[in-house]
């Protein structure tokens, strides 16, 4: 009897879905990593450097001490009864852990919580949002999630009814969006960021793409904006954000604001402004614009990817729609409690009067300053290489250089049945052990080629990364020179 489950009888939406950040090149890298373990010395490098994904602690970044102290005490509250605890943990981490435990049913991080998350933790997040923006925030608008990604899936599930429902997505884009739209059976409507203006978002182009989609019978439901940009690293100007908000209001679009890199800004002339702040600054209220804002504990200076914490905040949705959002959230019961606690700590960190503040601030400032130096070093190194141009990384955790490949390399890629930038990235991996993501996995202007590289290898390893990359690139260009 034939297998009851085969590729040709799977859900076609699953087959259509792709996620390049953990695609073919990463799978090959994992095979090479196993080879290094079982056959040391068999490859021209001795380690795999995963520069494909924003996963800071996997590349050596240390967690923030205050956050981990609070988590440890919440996970093992019996420690709070021991006298020696006062010599091992700061006074404010002890007091914060006690406050948080008092909010949790049964004082147990292994218990289920309310489907939106623990109310006291949502209160703390709302307070942090209000402090950041200068406008009130409400805990009832906040849904705690296992990272930001489940919140994106939830909204796609809510908004997409069939293949004629479209979502405007920036190109280049984070593949979560194309994958989620495909899984839920919708249409991705691309709008192109302008590489020549530092990956600028031009509402005139968004308008053009919107009108084109509507002319094809697509009902465009929402606009995705990623700020700071992933994979492109730009930070939107405040004036640009005002234009975007007005555009969404005028066109009747939900604004999906991916703001998970809000702490990652490396240039003095740019500042993060949340879209919630922009909406309220324009005087828009609940009747004017549906807005969903995403935040995560995985990025920023904290980099707690494996803890799976995050939230989305909804404003501008009617009570009946909110009931449906809550219903979808309830199907998953709740997000993990550790991630919920971390999200509250990220949005409500130590204050200047707290015992931990000096060490917390030193850790935060040190991490962000080092990331800025690494971004600048990689940008400078890539711009020195033949055929590569790299815009300034104003924020986020990546550089996204454009690479002008020789025609012979493009032909070799075609013969190998690969996109030219994927061919380049695969050769880079096999020669150096460095893992990057080809630009074709994010979308790009047709006829251009890019790759995304994280800025996350530890600072003392950056010179070696640059050296290995430079040697490879020069050899590659010589091999395929026209």
Swiss-Prot record:
Which reaction is the catalytic activity of this chain? L-alanine + 2-oxoglutarate = pyruvate + L-glutamate
InterPro entries cross-referenced by the UniProt entry: ALAT1/2-like, Aminotransferase_I/II_large, PyrdxlP-dep_Trfase, PyrdxlP-dep_Trfase_major, PyrdxlP-dep_Trfase_small
What EC identifiers does the entry list? 2.6.1.2
A GO molecular function held by the record = L-alanine:2-oxoglutarate aminotransferase activity
Name the coenzymes or cofactors required.
pyridoxal 5'-phosphate
User: What function does the entry list?
Assistant: Transfer of C3 units between the cytosol of mesophyll and bundle sheath cells to maintain a nitrogen-carbon balance in the C4-dicarboxylic pathway.
Q: Which family does it belong to?
A: Belongs to the class-I pyridoxal-phosphate-dependent aminotransferase family. Alanine aminotransferase subfamily.
Protein name as annotated: Alanine aminotransferase 2
Q: Which organism is it from?
A: Hordeum vulgare
